[in-house]
Amino acid sequence: MPAKEVISTVRALKAIKCKGIVCYSAGFKEIGKTGKYLEDRLIKECGDTPLIGPNCYGFINFSDNLALWPFSHKGDRCKKGIALITQSGMLSSDIIMATRSLPISFMVSAGNQAVTKIEDLIFYFSKKTNVSCIAIHIEGISDLTRFLAVSYTHLRA
């Protein structure tokens, strides 16, 4: 859906007690000042509701065979595997479509990380018993202190 319609959609989802949202739509801070304004409104509208994105492909949970992903993908169900986190939708798609024998438990395309940050995902996956390791591809870190703290904690787990 167009970025300008996302805010009202989030409001409607929250009204029906939606527990989390994936926002595929682009047209937010990645396009400049107007998009940044929309993204700030999106953050405010979400409040404490988790949101992956905007400007992302979403996530795939191979362990439970669940996907909020915009198109078909490859990958086998596995009991334990890698959690892959990337900001890039295209890279996540390329990885998922490659024919490999690598056991993947989760793939997350985090996009702009308006609400749910890469650090949140690292923390979440570090607690999952079906994750053997976490692999990340990042284009930038907005909170280096938090990133290092969460990463160090995961390394010790």
Locate predicted features:
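Catalytic-core regions of core metabolic enzymes
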Residues: 1-156
